[in-house]
Amino acid sequence: MKIGVFVPIGNNGWLISTHAPQYMPTFELNKAIVQKAEHYHFDFALSMIKLRGFGGKTEFWDHNLESFTLMAGLAAVTSRIQIYATAATLTLPPAIVARMAATIDSISGGRFGVNLVTGWQKPEYEQMGIWPGDDYFSRRYDYLTEYVQVLRDLWGSGKSDFKGDFFTMDDCRVSPQPSVPMKVICAGQSDAGMAFSARYADFNFCFGKGVNTPTAFAPTAARMKQAAEQTGRDVGSYVLFMVIADETDDAARAKWEHYKAGADEEALSWLTEQSQKDTRSGTDTNVRQMADPTSAVNINMGTLVGSYASVARMLDEVASVPGAEGVLLTFDDFLSGIETFGERIQPLMQCRAHLPALTQEVA
């Protein structure tokens, strides 16, 4: 099973809590995180894109770096780990993304890929005057289909004459082209999102579900597997989890309860309000899960809380689910979390037993 880190491009990572570590996103922080991840044989690093935060006492995600420029910098200071940036496709023409991706492919030596997002949070785009109207909620995957077709043209042949409802290319050129086939990833959980991933993505991200229920996402992975079978492609699921670990189950649980007790209710209310604005995409979207009050303090990603041995066991359970090819991990404290994962959790995981011995620790 592949292991990736979801780097904290926004302030405070993924805990919407006054009791969680409070920090700003910086290049130096993310460089330290990704270099540690590479040292511990993580397979990939991904950054999201967020253009407006949730506010509240913690100013959650009000402070964000930009994904492509951050990952270009991280590509230059790593040598093995795969690097993914996220394109907010309403903000960037596909020909520009194609050229930026080819540039980072050159920087990284063929280790770069692109995560495509359609955009669901209206205020991110309304503030710039580029929200296309609420009809976009029901047409966003039509838009993304044209977008990726332009990308594939430009990466494949260096030229596109694509004509569609959203994009018109007229002898559009991009050169140099990527040195290896460019990987495209997506994070669709709606039927439309999974159908898109089945046709165009190399793999699809999905949310884990619940606290210490590592296989609860299995129906989502099964839906993705079924959608991919319809297209004759192999598109695996990569599952998002937060790891909160300590020496004992009780110590880890105490951390989790402490974070929940400090939930930033103002920021969470804003998230709930935004999640209700898309009335056209169905009830199975990522944002619906994010705003569920059950565990909104970490946007309801799957949460693994326990001793190092318990977390290792639960991750092995994740690996046993058909269609689950990897996990994307966040941590309550990224630097110490990756270190304890690499030193104390990963060595106990049967699904990572193939890894080579560690070299000297990264500075």
Curated annotation (Swiss-Prot):
Pfam families in the cross-refs: Bac_luciferase
SUPFAM superfamilies attached to this UniProt entry: Bacterial luciferase-like (SSF51679)
Its biological purpose: The FMN-N(5)-oxide reacts spontaneously with NADH to produce FMN. Requires the flavin reductase RutF to regenerate FMN in vivo.
Family: Belongs to the NtaA/SnaA/DszA monooxygenase family. RutA subfamily.
Keyword Flavoprotein appears in the UniProt entry: yes
Name under which the protein is recorded: Pyrimidine monooxygenase RutA
Domain of life assignment: Bacteria
Positions bound to FMN: I49, K50, N115, E124, R140, Y141, S190
Keyword set, alphabetical order: Flavoprotein, FMN, Monooxygenase, NADP, Oxidoreductase
Induction remarks: Up-regulated by the nitrogen regulatory protein C (NtrC also called GlnG) and repressed by RutR.
GO biological process entries: alkanesulfonate catabolic process; nitrogen utilization; uracil catabolic process
Organism: Escherichia coli O6:K15:H31 (strain 536 / UPEC)
Catalytic activity: uracil + FMNH2 + NADH + O2 = (Z)-3-ureidoacrylate + FMN + NAD(+) + H2O + H(+); thymine + FMNH2 + NADH + O2 = (Z)-2-methylureidoacrylate + FMN + NAD(+) + H2O + H(+)
InterPro entries with a match to the protein in the record: Luciferase-like_dom (IPR011251), Luciferase-like_sf (IPR036661), Pyrimidine_monooxygenase_RutA (IPR019914), SsuD_RutA_monooxygenase (IPR050172)
Molecular function terms from GO: alkanesulfonate monooxygenase activity; uracil oxygenase activity
EC number: 1.14.99.46
Cytoplasm as UniProt keyword: no
Higher taxonomy: Bacteria, Pseudomonadati, Pseudomonadota, Gammaproteobacteria, Enterobacterales
